[in-house]
From Swiss-Prot:
Enzyme Commission code: 2.3.1.189
Subunit structure: Monomer.
NCBIfam families found in the cross-reference section: mycothiol_MshD
Protein name (Swiss-Prot/TrEMBL): Mycothiol acetyltransferase
A molecular function GO annotation: mycothiol synthase activity
One biological process term in Gene Ontology: mycothiol biosynthetic process
Organism in which the protein naturally occurs: Paenarthrobacter aurescens (strain TC1)
Amino acid sequence: MSHAHPENWPVLIIAGALDTELLRDVKTLAAAAGESDGNPPFSEQTLVTLRGADAGDHSVLSFVLYAPDEDSDPATAEDLAGVAVVVENGDESGVLELAVHPSYRNQGVAGRLLDALQGKRGLGGLSAWSHGNHEAAAELATRFGYGPVRELWKMRLMSSTSALPDAGLPDGVSLRAFVPGQDEQAWLTANSAAFSHHPEQGSMTRADLEARKAEDWFDPEGFLLAVNAEGELLGFHWTKVHPRQGPHPAIGEVYVVGVTPEAQGLGLGKALTVAGIKHLQDQGLHAVMLYVDADNEAAVALYQKLGFVRWDTDVMYGPLTKN
């Protein structure tokens, strides 16, 4: 490990997709950070974008800081000190996520990355996620004139919690599993309608869906579709299982639940939520988690009634003044 100061280390700036070796190194760093913190430093969408973007695509910028080490040439994952990734939204705004390897923390690595970002792109229009709301992230945000603008709660239901309530499906509605090669377009249409108010989820494309289907965690049996007697898709509950990571056991996730506008108000959302949770619990998982915006009082109340409790918080930081 190098004992030089990070302010003297070169920052690599890459536009677009990362090459195979660098993406591997970033995943290794992310796994080490996640094991140390109990939270993954990058969102799933960010990793999907890093794999799928075109080379040279400036809507995705990665700032990579390798610690120079005379005993390591070329650089390896063990020498990757930190990474910052900016994904532009196309409207002069973007989202920043940053990770520092546990072995290189408290040495100024994050500040070095942000200085490079500020020099290359500037911070204008950028918001930044802190997954787990770490104290160091809050201090760094303050240094750069940022403050909290959004809270995303992580809620958890332990399998030892009392039984889930009964939540029957509306008359004429049945559940079945997603069928790859058949249901993609119907799901994209239903998802867009269900989340017309939610730009992140509602704007999912076929490429986004295919990228998730290619992930190791994808299981069509855990992708539940609610259909009417004519086979029309009215709602869905897509579940996910996160594998064990170091000391952290595997855990299920209420990945996304959606109901089309014409089927809302029938109790279908609750029925889908309960059905998906039961599917996850039947796999022997110790707990099920989900993400929900802290200010979505109706959703928080529903999940609390099902036995979920607040477990952790992701905080989005935004500029307090125009950069």
